[in-house]
Amino acid sequence: MRDTYESPLASRYADKEMKYLFSPDMKFKTWRRLWIALAESEMELGLPVTQEQVDELKAHAEDINYEVAEERERLVRHDVMSHVYAYGQQCPKAAGIIHLGATSCYVGDNTDIIIMTEAMKIVRKKLVNVIRILSHFAEEYKDLPTLAFTHFQPAQPTTVGKRATLWMQEFLMDLEDVEYQLSKAKLLGSKGTTGTQASFLELFDGNDEMAAKIDAKIAEKMGYESCFAVSGQTYPRKLDSQMLNVLSCIAQSAAKFSNDIRLLQHLKEVEEPFEKNQIGSSAMAYKRNPMRSERIASLARYIVVDALNPAITASTQWFERTLDDSANKRISVPEAFLATDAILNLVMNVADGLVVYPKVIEQHLRRELPFMATENIMMDAAKRGADRQELHEHVRVHSMAASKVIKEEGGENDLLERIANDPIFGVTLDELKGIVDPHKYVGRAPRQTEIFLHDVVKPVLDRYADTETETAEINL
């Protein structure tokens, strides 16, 4: 539709699988599953619900008569009761026991939890794929020296693969958070208007033991281990905040990754994928802009800010419930998951297609490494009997002169030639070139990468060996 606003997260960025989870069809089919679980639990606990009624509900769990529900909602202005009515039209024998003892939050809140849980499983799957892709990259480039940067100024070299482990480590931390959230997932259950289960105590004629069993049965039928032990009318809105905090952390990790790629692309050391017919600029035809990484950064900023919504909502809920959560969470929660889905698709796409330019990396090392090697050069000369303080002064003078050539004349770094021509050092240019072999300055970076991949990453990937390997397709 060209005359109606559509969220770009749905129309442009997120995958079909994630979009379906937050669709009306998913929501209303889950409502029906919950009504079936409630009726079946009530039947098993001895309430006047028959197997015939339960079977009738199950027979129409999927074929929702949306037109009937929508017409009814225009009349009664209540979405839950409209769908109770529509379900009852299809299930006349069960119409009288649909939603028995429940409140709107029984279907609404439990459905929200189920959808968020399933959405988090998609996030988990894609996080694992991000880690898998980056592990291949780190393994391939674990030995390739490159300049490290602190304050975005050249620093002691690392390796391209070791740098990738830093990105991976943050995504692994995020995966731990996702796993923790999924490990403690629980439903609201059916606790009534203020969380006291008064309606069920009435249905069971004051039998506390029977009323207390309803939640456990519902949880089991819906595939959960438990429900919240206590609640008001709703599940604690802090759950939404915790969920979106996890997504915010993923966004932070992705933004860090994308910013590094953008800077590396500026240096022409590493580039994100660039399609054969892709246009970087409408005016500057030669440009290769890192638009995927820029989109990651843009969406990440949105998620980090969006995560404030449920935090503020949770902190401003009154007593057993207020409705000022509803409109906000209808927007903030789905959009956060859709944006995270989009980000992880982009990270997979970028990481899987990174292009490394070793010759450019080598050129940058040649320009900077002589300065970093001067301490080793001084120590070698001192061991041969030269005065350390004189050596230091000569290095300082030569370094300033070489730096001037680079910065003011645009020339190459000639520090090694200056040192070779200075008799105080007593060393040839060939000997100096051996001293400044970049592999000698990366410390334990290659070994650190190997250990990290074997001891930290491999156990995670082995645990998720059955996780489907994805190749992300994105809209440019």
Stretches found by the model and what they are:
Residues 139-161, 271-287, 320-327, 352-372:
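Glycine-rich cofactor-pocket loops
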Residues 19-23, 68-70, 278-298, 320-335, ...:
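Short beta-alpha connecting loops at secondary-structure transitions
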Residues 302-388, 394:
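Long, amphipathic alpha-helical stalk/connector segments used for oligomerization, subunit docking
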Residues 38-41, 123, 127-130, 134-137, ...:
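Amphipathic alpha-helices that form helix-helix packing interfaces
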Residues 1-198, 204-219, 280-281, 291-295, ...:
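A helix-coil-helix interface module used to build multimeric assemblies
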Residues 162, 241-249, 376-384:
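Short, well-ordered beta-strand elements within core beta-sheets of diverse protein domains
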Residues 174, 225, 232-326, 330:
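Glycine-rich anion/phosphate-binding loop at the beta-strand->alpha-helix junction
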Residues 271, 394-401:
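Active/binding-pocket-proximal capping segment
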